[in-house]
Amino acid sequence: MLRSLVCFAVLAAFTLPCRGDQTVPPAETVIRLTVQPMAAPKPALRYLLLPELKEMNPGNPIHGYLRCFSEQQGFFYNKEACERRDKLQSLPLKELLAQELQDYGKIALRQADWAARLDKPDWQILLKLKTDGVSLLLPDVQEMRSLANALKVRFRAEVALGRFDDALRTAKTMFALSRHMSEHPTLIGGLVGVAITLIAIGPLEEMLEQPGCPNLYWALTNLPNPLISLDKGMEGERVLIAGEFRDLNDSAPMSEDQLQKLIAHIDKVREVEKIEQKPGLPDRSTRTWLDARIKDEGLVSAARRRLVEVGHPEERLLRFPAEQVLLLDEMRAFEVGRDEVMKLTNLPTWQAETLAGQIKPAKKEALFGFLVPALLKVRNAQGRLEQRIALLRHVEALRLYAAEHDGKLPVTLSEIPVPLPLDPFTGKPFRYQVDGATAHLRGTPPPGWEKSPGHNIHYEVIIQK
């Protein structure tokens, strides 16, 4: 599948709730958990959610993951097997025939366990990223989601059987797989990493409800934050764009033939825009865009002046065709807009969201402006995962508190003795209230997403005495 199509497909998936209660109004996703009081394990880090160094071996996990599919092709690709797996992922835990599924996937998923504990992830795709650009095919990335779905079934079976050590081994495999996705030099890799983590969180929540489940507060606390880094993907986007427009010459005048080839290539790149366009919109071909501007000497002169301001020699620009000047200026504008978003990536989520809201959207007539909003959506997805993990830390903190207070819930979060993370989208404590025997934990949606159920996560936690 083309990189651009994969990106939109993955982003669309994040509009769906994750193990929420569908009987409530669609304004929020309610996740109801009935849990037991449970003190922290001794030693505190007995349970972790990523493989420890002592479990690791030298090697490239990516090759290991892909080998899973060659071990059992029918298991992954057979239509009946896929349909059964879809059902097993959503079947109520008590209806799961766990005994039959405890070695689900057999050698293929045991191979995934091995791969997740190799120490040097390398997707070996950088050269193709430079040459193929937006046409880059990403079948390996999509297959990782299939692998995660299969691991989820085994995870659920282990939870249903009360085999917590085995279940946490599978959780480690899934969390490691998601982290390895962030080593992929595309934002799609990071998005799939977020998606895989959310796939793992469903069975993890089910495990918390099982009698005797160990408390995972410190396991969740010791996860890297952010769990899925976007650094490699953001760098890859810069490489990709530079490769796509390498024929846009800024050092010498371009011939008519060179310009025509470049314009045709730009139209190919902009095909991604048509995915979101509504029928009936006017022609937005690059040629049409240029023809509307090259006759206006004022526009061309202004473009040339902006290029001079960023360091291009004016005497050289005066020898360039008007189309070349306009395209160079449009690329300059795109890079400025792109970096206004990219520079926010490693800020705390609430700061990034606040500053992103102040960014002026690209002008409707901008040739490449459509590429920038996707960056904001990817950062938003990363923040939502951060919020979900932080909420789970709160759930486990409630279990810690209840274990020390005869099964009672705290009236306020300030009564909890362990550190609690702030809501990533506000930089403030999560919303919390107690209604009888039920604690309500709510995350605040990012600005503009107040009516989206997938952005309004509400945990209802009942402590079982």
Predicted regions and their residues:
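Bacterial N-terminal signal peptides
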Residues: L5-T15
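Short acidic linear motifs
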Residues: F8, C18-K465
